């Protein structure tokens, strides 16, 4: 393994902000430094020429100061057994530059923590702040990092023994996996698998829970409503669709795809020609595609990745509209409870506390907008508008009741273009192969649909944390290039 130090990983502002957060957890910390560090897995020792080429590839970024350079060392790397999107891109660049002996390049961050009392190590809570424990790990010895290049066997799927233990086995899996299945759904699954005379796998239950969650199926909004013994004519979704029913002129697609489409006009597209691999102008009818959705639960648990993946999911839905569309501009919006800004608290802000498993309104508004904007920027779509609102009020009649947005509303949306020939999906013949386009399938963010369907606080904090996806704008950009 070859090790090469890189540039500073944090801007001075970000480094100072991180230091303040660390000091709030451990008052023994006096300073912080951070720089990228590169690990290279090569088949043999590099020649002097190839070593110089590799060093030039790994010289990048602004010339920021490193911060503290002497002190307690912590190294943060992608979890062993995973390959980061940065790694795949850097390795490709090395291959193109003729470094055929380089098998893989991976990047981490070397943190230097200065301490008042050198006999004390930093507290675990402070170290946890330096990495995302879902996608990264922290080590104290650089020699341990060589394990990142070890290929691990995928963990096998397990089965839930309903043939022996019946519904009880499903109830245990429901709790442990955070599936949010109700009794009726568990009875349905039990009946179906007993008919098949086999046990379900954990993967099957996880997939069913997501596809059948309130987040995906909107069972409440599609349900029949009976109020005071009178069955209502329309569901909540029917009422939402009334706007389209009463004013559908120039609407080409609505409530049947990942995003809606309204009619546009003829214009020139600047697109690649698949025949000669060159860009050119193509005159076609260009329609407008639009989408808005929410990402409330993930943003409440972990604001930055919650808001970032909210934008990422909305971009994915736009791209998957019809037979492929092109996202162009985005929006983000936030509704939260009182902010309680330190040294600037307002007279109307009365504290009622908050659940431990969710972020505060201030944390959401510090990290959430940055997550949404950063993802849009990294994908290559400007985030051009949004809104921000705070509201929290005690009920004047019910003394123990308060209203507000402890679980925030986090809105993501956007607009883009789609060609006339791509507005509607074609029928898929039986037996067709399906390509799943994107990153590796890891247990990160799986369970978000079912977790968001639970009442806040009924899940445990680890399941809540695991249910938040992690952003990967670069990989989504690659997928978008395949689509358009």
Residue ranges and their predicted role:
Residues 1-484:
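Core nucleic-acid recognition elements
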